[in-house]
Amino acid sequence: MIEPTREVEHLGLRWNTKKMTVSLTEKRMANIEEKAENIKRRGGCTLKELQSFLGKLEASRAAIVIARLHFRFMQALLRGKEDDKEFIKFNEKAKIDLQWWIDFARKHSTSPLQAPRLAKLNIKTDASGDAGWGGHSRRGWTQARWERKEKHKHINWKEMEAAKKCIAEHMKSREHVQIEMDSLTSTCIINSMARSTSATLRQKALEIWEIILSNQGWLTQNGYRKRRTK
């Protein structure tokens, strides 16, 4: 007699239909930790090894939903590299990414199959080139002028900084923030969990997500507004 199973392992993932969760198997998690420790000891790895390691991290996303936030600076090391045997020395940002997989990945290696129900909060933000920034939600308005050191930043940085400030001001615990911005570029960087050729914008996206996750919430883009031209 065949008994139905409530737990299935496939490609390093364990699917549990009783608990409604997906987890990395112990073997897969231990392998990632071992590879990370090895790279840390050497201060880097070859291009081929880095590509293989990043492939393992990408494959973990079903169980570790915030995985992308913790490999973008390692991913950036691939840019311009072609020789599989070339040794790539990790910079400080990449080392921080790597350390997260050693210290914290296991704690995040199980995720619910259904997203938790969170109260929704819509926030609309805007950033002016020279004047300042602002935003509003059902909780009211927030606005300020740029500081002198911020005035000469790129407009995409300003759009993301405006979003960060408004989220920090308006968001409460366990809310799903839906944010609307003017910049398509900034929208894509936030949605992709910090995928960008710019290290500055990657860092800004990480700061935004840090606020969201520290409040046990989530973030999605509610589209972007195309600027009107006269």
Predicted regions and their residues:
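C-terminal reverse transcriptase regions that engage the nucleic-acid substrate
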Residues: 2-112
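Two-metal-ion RNase H-like nuclease active-site motif
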Residues: 116-130
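RNase H catalytic domain
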Residues: 167-229
